[in-house]
């Protein structure tokens, strides 16, 4: 029987426990998953503080930490092309073949639907707390963010000094308002 491969694209800014739970639940529905690291070209911005490479390392380590079979996923950085009419073709060119698309983004869902793909909503996991926005906010406010991310994420964040990076980016954005 042919393997069913799905795709899930997210910015992963940062990787958190919700991402891991969604990946686990998605792997209950498909044999393999392509995990697209969205907006791969973006980094060192308040909304997108981490490089694609940092996000790949964070995600890989978190998946290993959660005993997710490395043979069940592919992690592919995906740059934005800002041209919706050909975006699906771009994604298809950059990834292994897939038949099921998991997305909570209405534009992504519409684009893949128009190209004939089966589109499913990913299973959301405690979206109120487990969002990149909430984790970045907690990091900036010196609140407990560590409980929302895998241990592997904490280790890499300390390695790249991510809290300091985020705070410096916030200072930079505030100073640019006055310009």
Predicted regions mapped to residue ranges:
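Nucleotidyltransferase catalytic core that binds NTPs
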Residues: 1-179
């Amino acid at each position: 029987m042919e393997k069913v491969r799905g795709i899930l694209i997210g910015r992963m800014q940062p990787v958190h426990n919700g991402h891991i739970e969604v990946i686990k639940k998605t792997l209950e529905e498909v044999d393999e998953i392509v995990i697209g690291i969205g907006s791969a070209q973006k980094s060192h911005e308040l909304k997108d503080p981490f490089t694609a490479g940092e996000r790949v390392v964070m995600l890989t380590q978190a998946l290993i930490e959660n005993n997710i079979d490395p043979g069940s996923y592919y992690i592919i950085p995906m740059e934005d092309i800002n041209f919706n009419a050909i975006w699906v073709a771009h994604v298809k060119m950059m990834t292994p073949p897939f038949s099921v698309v998991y997305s909570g983004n209405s534009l992504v869902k519409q684009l893949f639907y128009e190209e004939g793909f089966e589109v499913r909503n990913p299973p959301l996991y405690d979206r109120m707390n487990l969002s990149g926005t909430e984790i970045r906010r907690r990091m900036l406010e010196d609140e407990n963010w560590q409980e929302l991310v895998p241990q592997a994420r904490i280790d890499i964040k300390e390695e790249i000094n991510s809290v300091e990076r985020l705070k410096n980016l916030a200072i930079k954005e505030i100073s640019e308002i006055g310009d």
